[in-house]
Amino acid sequence: MANKTVLFNKHLESNAKMVDFHGWDMPLNYGSQIEEHHAVRQDAGMFDVSHMTVVDVTGTDACAFLRKLLANDVAKLKVPGKALYGGMLDDNAGIIDDLITYYLTDTFYRVVVNSATREKDLAWIAKQSQGFDVTVTERPELAMIAVQGPNAKAKAAAVFSSEQNAAIEGMKPFFGKQAGSLFIATTGYTGEAGYEIIVPETEAEALWQALLDQGVKPCGLGARDTLRLEAGMNLYGLDMDETINPLAANMGWTIAWEPTDRDFIGRKALEALRDAGTDKLVGLVMEEKGVLRHDMPVFFTDAAGVEQQGVITSGTFSPTLGYSIAMARVPSSIGDTAEVEMRKKRVAVRVVAPNFVRNGKQAF
């Protein structure tokens, strides 16, 4: 029996095509994935992300616990509401999950983890919390709606109360604030401005309808995937998992190496990998016909004249750019060009930073 979010009936009202997503009945699209994608790049779209898992970590050791649990350092968060992104690693520096952590008070942090990894994440967090004075509380009574796009904030403002708008006025990117019954965060998975709104399940349908009434277009998993790939954002299970370390997943920037005495889980293994050198995640662009896809092999000749091989982790046609893009894990000796094997022939591709579109425009 698949799980259903509290917005399931709203999706059916908008003629969503529903699919199974890691045990959840979720909308793939509402008729046109391309139109939904363009709505987010050009206007405003919204996603039901209530399948994501909200976990509150409270207690006198909350900071110390999260400094051990995460490769990024929550001690950097000094202003209430500030958030950071990073990996939760195992002892071998494999990525158990990537997640966002909000600092609310010295004894209260909110962590948002992926739905596909929920059970193993909760088990790992519970296991590692032993010996710390913390309480770990899953919040299944909370739903979440992401509103994204150049007009998303303005359209959301028409739905928020005057008190809520006052509370979030001038809020910088990667912040979250409790405003009335809503937890409103300037985060997202699209490369556009907007909000991720954590809302009590009892109020979620009304919020979704109010946003719909403001002309915010419902968007499904299809558009969510093409948008995040254009933005160069990893998808857990495709671009990284427990067999991949953050240095090989374009997540090196999320590792807080300083202070050197912070012994986060996976640190020793990660230091050894850093010193030895790892593969890296790059962007690929193919302007001729065809679509780059997950698992296609990537070839290039290094400076020493030796053929090297990597693999595409995520690939798609980019609706914004009009040609195919991909992320690929390759040896770090790669240059500016490579070849991808598709339909039993090799096709030339450009190698770029894994960040293709930001705020509606080409980013490379």
From Swiss-Prot:
GO terms for molecular function: aminomethyltransferase activity; transaminase activity. It catalyses: N(6)-[(R)-S(8)-aminomethyldihydrolipoyl]-L-lysyl-[protein] + (6S)-5,6,7,8-tetrahydrofolate = N(6)-[(R)-dihydrolipoyl]-L-lysyl-[protein] + (6R)-5,10-methylene-5,6,7,8-tetrahydrofolate + NH4(+). The keyword Transferase applies. InterPro entries: GCS_T, GCS_T_bac, GCST_C, GCV_T_N, GcvT/YgfZ/DmdA, GcvT/YgfZ_C, TrmE/GcvT_dom1. GO terms for cellular component: cytosol; glycine cleavage complex. Signal peptide: none annotated. GO terms for biological process: glycine decarboxylation via glycine cleavage system. Keywords: Aminotransferase, Transferase. It comes from the Bacteria. Its EC number is 2.1.2.10. HAMAP family: GcvT (MF_00259). The glycine cleavage system catalyzes the degradation of glycine. The glycine cleavage system is composed of four proteins: P, T, L and H. This is Aminomethyltransferase. The gene is gcvT.
